[in-house]
Amino acid sequence: ASDVYKRQPYENAQFMLFFAAVVKAVDEYQDLLRVSVSSAGNDCRLGGNEAPPAIISVFTGEELGETIEAIDKGVNPAAKAKRVLKLGVDSLPDFPMDTTDRNRTSPFAFTGNKFEFRMLGSSFSVAGPNLILNTVVAEELEQFADALEGAHDFMNELNDLVAKTIREHKRIIFNGNNYSEEWAKEAAKRGLLNLKSSDE
């Protein structure tokens, strides 16, 4: 069991399995997640340069992004020293550099220790989106459990499942500027949905 719980993302099998389940769920159920935040007011807000766009994607951050890239290429992720913020004051401790989504343009972002679903309008109850999000992630975890329960070599099969899932659903991962026109074109090439209004 000690191999399952480690500090680095790529060493933490349980974390990577849950991460893969969330990525798969967001990719496969983009439409349900978008519907969960639909309203006339929110349709105008999304993509209005003060909120995420209507195209759903997952922001992973630099550290996790490099881990995903390594897994996708079939190589072992290497530990990378955390960058520290230099304050120029000797009496203050070093602070680790933030690798999260600083410009907050991503609708679904991993921010170091949690996911944030940022498409909800201020008047929304979180109940509906949470119900959908929990249900779709549970669906993916059930599929993973079915695949792993009879595993002969659990850790190898878990790693293979994570790698396969990331390769099949990496189109939903985007770490750039979600407001850019280039992203809208790239998202269309990737086959991602751009449901700008509730009618769609």
Show where each model-derived region lies.
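Acidic, glycine-enriched catalytic cores built around paired aspartates
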Residues: 25-200
